[in-house]
């Protein structure tokens, strides 16, 4: 009930202003009696992924809490894990406003945020300050002004800084809102990046006597051949996981709607089928050697079950969470337990 009232108010506001208000409010109320307004108890449904055991298979996707400011509040809602970021080595403002648009009739969102964040050092402070033991993945990217050819250096800088504070690290090369970033998904650039990241991971594991898994987040706008090539690169470089998928540049299912022609990545219900299709193809290519975290257009328990059936071991929600609220977490976990 509280979420429905809050949503009604926030949906009257500019989307980005509403987002900042929500994150700020959650930050203020976390670890206080006010968590009763959105907290809930969820029966555990443990799942093992990438050598880690999560209390349930539903996580918060990257992009919601970029700077890790409200981790404890999301823990109170019952998420099995929270993925913070995308974070870059240096703070950056992101793209020009406006850059976030609701497509309410389609339960979709278009964003062209451009990795706006306060930088990796700020994120690390927030990770150290969190009071709960929730599993936190850290999604890392490159700064906009870093040439693509030198992009791997940004990923290595972020890895070095977050390594001790992350349950796992997600490598984001699939956002459509950083010029040239998606080119890292192909050919020699992909292999060079994955190889450098794997080498760094093993160095850090030896240095800190702690192995932190690494997952690659991919786009939905890929051909079968491109998915096959990514799968082969993941296996070759012994990556621990894949996250499928990011937002899409297609506009299927939203034509004619207000804001549908805005540039950026489309998420939410219009992405559901495309994301599931990519997960299914990726699962075929990976042959069970690397687990998949499924994300993209999960608006109901049924959508989540379709991701599991396609080959995902765990799921993440973002747009569906905005439209449905915390109850979606419980609905998915309950459906998973009965599966």
Curated annotation (Swiss-Prot):
One of its GO terms (cellular component) is plasma membrane. It is found in: Cell membrane. FMN binds at residues 62-66, 86, 139, 172, 217, 245, 268, 297, 318-319. Belongs to the dihydroorotate dehydrogenase family. Type 2 subfamily. Pathway: Pyrimidine metabolism; UMP biosynthesis via de novo pathway; orotate from (S)-dihydroorotate (quinone route): step 1/1. This is Dihydroorotate dehydrogenase (quinone). Catalyzes the conversion of dihydroorotate to orotate with quinone as electron acceptor. Substrate binds at residues 66, 111-115, 172, 177, 246-247. Its main location: membrane. Its cofactor is FMN. The lineage of its organism: Bacteria, Pseudomonadati, Pseudomonadota, Gammaproteobacteria, Alteromonadales. Its EC number is 1.3.5.2. Binds 1 FMN per subunit. Keywords: Cell membrane, Flavoprotein, FMN, Membrane, Oxidoreductase, Pyrimidine biosynthesis. It holds the Pfam family DHO_dh. GO terms for molecular function: dihydroorotate dehydrogenase (quinone) activity. The active site is at residue 175.
